[in-house]
């Protein structure tokens, strides 16, 4: 593991106690970077600092920062101007309050850092950490990083490490009043019950390791294939858009699909075991509420929504066990189906998105106005605006380019 490099050194001011600390970035971007090339010769394009008035390139020493206070009029500021601003917190994390973490809306959080005690600060660092653990509080502080003052929240992270989250000031958070499309529609009790049931069926302990950057992996595979000279892969078929049906049926189908997904390996389609068996679903958290019976699904004695047939829950491919009473077993690829006495031997119809034939007289369902998006697009990344080659993300266009 590569050693971390401290990006800031200072002190935590805790009353009359000062704690020397070092600051490290806690996260790093894994975005792939792409150079912009001149296609005929495959040479990286350069961006030069050019003054259109003087009609020449300018050196770095000739460049200053300017604030446009009127159209075309600037006031310039130099490094010594920024240094002259009286900020007591320039090299100090000044703790000004302690609050409970749940009182802070996550929208205020910006970037995360690790704090490590500096020379001679281990005991005071440990004392602050222990006191915060005992009281269940996080510290609110002021800090200046890169000539910008920020609010910050200090909290106990893990393995005895204090983490610092820089925070936005209130005037940096846009008001929700600017959103005009938020409505309060009337909801039927059955719809609420089905929606909460879908949430419960997808509830599991949070485990970051379950979630992978599938877009980045696919992009790396594409790059490796092009390096090896492999022909480009044919694009897959676009997902079919089912006809718009009742919201209740769409929710019911979503619950069936979620249950099948959990049985098949969870949120990310977990890898099979060494013997080829599918992974076991993640156990529910002890704090998670027990699932309630959902109208129209097995386990609820009440009748389903009038006019909407309730299909039995499908079994996930490769998962064995007794079928739901009164329903035929799901077809497993390569395994002959065993007929249940008194029932036909046809496979159980499944929800849209679960491979199987649809039930007679039904069509794939979708929620009005909701479209399925492909796996997340690569987030745009910054590019270097200097006289070296620009680096941009896959969907970015460099400003001021040729």
Swiss-Prot record:
Q: Record keywords: DNA damage included?
A: yes
CDD domains (alphabetical): KU_like
Q: Which Gene3D superfamilies does the record cross-reference, listed alphabetically?
A: 2.40.290.10
Which Pfam family is one of this chain's hits?
Ku
Show the GO MF annotations.
Answer: double-stranded DNA binding
- Residue ranges annotated as compositionally biased, kind Low complexity, are 299-308, 332-343, 359-376
Q: Domain Ku, which positions?
A: 12-185
The record's keywords, sorted A to Z, are: DNA damage, DNA recombination, DNA repair, DNA-binding
Region of interest: Disordered:
261-402
* Residue spans of biased composition, Pro residues class: 344-358
Under the heading InterPro entries, the entry gives: Ku70/Ku80_beta-barrel_dom, Prok_Ku, SPOC-like_C_dom_sf
DNA damage is among the record's keywords: yes
- Any single GO BP term: DNA recombination
Its annotated function is as follows: With LigD forms a non-homologous end joining (NHEJ) DNA repair enzyme, which repairs dsDNA breaks with reduced fidelity. Binds linear dsDNA with 5'- and 3'- overhangs but not closed circular dsDNA nor ssDNA. Recruits and stimulates the ligase activity of LigD.
Assembly notes: Homodimer. Interacts with LigD.
Question: Cross-referenced NCBIfam families, in alphabetical order?
Answer: Ku_bact (TIGR02772)
Q: Which family does it belong to?
A: Belongs to the prokaryotic Ku family.
What is the protein's name according to its record?
Answer: Non-homologous end joining protein Ku
Q: What organism is this sequence from?
A: Symbiobacterium thermophilum (strain DSM 24528 / JCM 14929 / IAM 14863 / T)
């Amino acid at each position: 593991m590569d050693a971390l490099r401290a990006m800031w050194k200072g002190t935590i001011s805790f009353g009359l106690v000062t704690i020397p600390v070092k600051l490290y970035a806690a996260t790093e971007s894994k975005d792939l970077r792409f150079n912009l090339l001149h296609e005929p010769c495959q040479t990286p394009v350069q961006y030069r600092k050019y003054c259109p008035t003087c009609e020449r390139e300018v050196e770095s020493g000739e460049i200053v920062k300017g604030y446009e206070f009127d159209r075309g009029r600037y006031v310039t500021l130099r490094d010594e101007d920024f240094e002259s601003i009286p900020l007591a917190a320039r090299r100090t994390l000044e703790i000004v309050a302690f609050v409970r973490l749940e009182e802070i809306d996550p929208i205020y959080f910006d970037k995360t850092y690790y704090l490590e005690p500096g020379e001679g600060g281990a005991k005071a660092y440990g004392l602050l950490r222990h006191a915060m653990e005992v009281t269940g509080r996080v510290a609110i502080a002021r800090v200046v990083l890169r000539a910008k003052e920020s609010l910050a929240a200090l909290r106990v992270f893990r393995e005895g490490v204090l983490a610092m989250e820089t925070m936005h000031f209130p005037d940096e958070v846009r008001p929700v009043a600017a959103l005009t499309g938020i409505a309060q529609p009337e909801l039927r009790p059955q719809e609420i019950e089905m929606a909460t049931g879908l949430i419960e069926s997808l509830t599991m302990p949070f485990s970051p390791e379950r979630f992978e950057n599938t877009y980045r992996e696919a992009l790396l595979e594409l790059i490796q294939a092009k390096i090896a000279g492999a022909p480009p892969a044919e694009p897959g078929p676009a997902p079919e858009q089912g006809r718009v049906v009742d919201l209740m049926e769409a929710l019911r189908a979503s619950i069936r699909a979620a249950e099948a997904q959990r049985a098949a390996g969870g949120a990310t389609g977990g890898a099979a075991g060494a013997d080829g068996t599918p992974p076991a679903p993640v156990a529910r958290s002890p704090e998670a509420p027990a699932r309630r019976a959902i109208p129209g699904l097995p386990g609820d004695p009440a009748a389903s929504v009038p006019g909407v047939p309730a299909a039995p829950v499908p079994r996930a491919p490769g998962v064995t066990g007794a079928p739901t009473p009164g329903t035929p077993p799901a077809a497993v690829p390569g395994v002959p189906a065993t007929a249940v006495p008194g029932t036909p031997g046809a496979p159980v119809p499944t929800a849209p998105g679960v491979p199987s034939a649809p039930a007679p007289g039904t069509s794939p369902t979708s929620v009005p106005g909701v479209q399925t998006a492909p796996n997340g697009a690569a987030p745009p990344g910054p590019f270097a605006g200097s006289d070296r080659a620009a680096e941009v993300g896959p969907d970015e266009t460099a400003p001021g380019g040729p």
